[in-house]
UniProtKB/Swiss-Prot annotation:
The record marks A87, K88 as: Cleavage. Interacts with ASTL. It comes from the Eukaryota. It comes from Pan troglodytes (Chimpanzee). The gene is SPACA3. GO terms for biological process: fusion of sperm to egg plasma membrane involved in single fertilization. Residues 85-215 are extracellular. Keywords: Cytoplasmic vesicle, Disulfide bond, Membrane, Signal-anchor, Transmembrane, Transmembrane helix. Belongs to the glycosyl hydrolase 22 family. This is Sperm acrosome membrane-associated protein 3. Sperm surface membrane protein that may be involved in sperm-egg plasma membrane adhesion and fusion during fertilization. It could be a potential receptor for the egg oligosaccharide residue N-acetylglucosamine, which is present in the extracellular matrix over the egg plasma membrane. The processed form has no detectable bacteriolytic activity in vitro.
């Protein structure tokens, strides 16, 4: 019986190495489970003791299913099961109505069209937009508000003028985003703080940004 087990072509069944970069974590998990089942069926099933089967199973798990791969597969599985937050992509008039309701039309002398134009050229109307700068700071939300001064990414010794976490600026209801944007426009630069507004919106006819929108 021992000699028969030694002749079992276990290695030939699993010709693809586990470390292959083209195989994902979940696929490796499936390969691990199928390899164990195949090897056990080749060993003769009922002619092998339960203790022997268990020992072989443990050996196969150690050989073909390293702990790191098992953990990766588990993380992938959990990420599929847990609910994910959906990014909110606003329409032009939809965003104009929301910003109008928050009181941005005419705030600090800027029209509603200024704000809609700004949102388009900073984030493309994406409330969950997140961009990383070379210095490690982040631009957050529909107005791409930066973490160097206005919000907190838990980086020590960094101002947090808006007194909120940067993740709050990714909320699709835009309340925190509008509060922070109002504080920014209270600065001497106003909307000029945003380079996108200076290049694409300032001094231009912006009526098209709110044209046809009902409030």
């Amino acid at each position: 019986m021992v000699s028969a087990l030694r002749r079992a072509p276990l290695i030939r069944v699993h010709s693809s190495p586990v470390s292959s970069p083209s195989v994902s974590g979940p696929q490796r998990l499936v390969s691990c489970l199928s390899s164990q089942s195949s090897a056990l069926s080749q060993s003769g099933g009922g002619s092998t003791s339960a203790a022997g089967i268990e020992a072989r199973s443990r050996a196969l798990r150690r050989r073909w299913c390293p702990a790191g791969i098992m953990l990766l597969a588990l993380v992938c599985l959990l990420s599929c099961l847990l609910p994910s937050s959906e990014a909110k992509l606003y329409g032009r008039c939809e965003l104009a109505r929301v910003l109008h309701d928050f009181g941005l039309d005419g705030y600090r002398g800027y029209s509603l069209a200024d704000w809609v134009c700004l949102a388009y050229f900073t984030s493309g109307f994406n409330a969950a937009a997140l961009d990383y700068e070379a210095d490690g700071s982040t631009n957050n939300g529909i107005f791409q508000i930066n973490s160097r001064r206005w919000c907190s990414n838990l980086t020590p010794n960094v101002p947090n003028v808006c007194q909120m976490y940067c993740s709050d600026l990714l909320n699709p209801n835009l309340k925190d985003t509008v509060i922070c944007a109002m504080k920014i426009t209270q600065e001497p630069q106003g909307l000029g703080y945003w380079e996108a507004w200076r290049h694409h919106c300032q001094g231009k006819d912006l009526t098209e940004w709110v044209d046809g929108c009902d409030f």
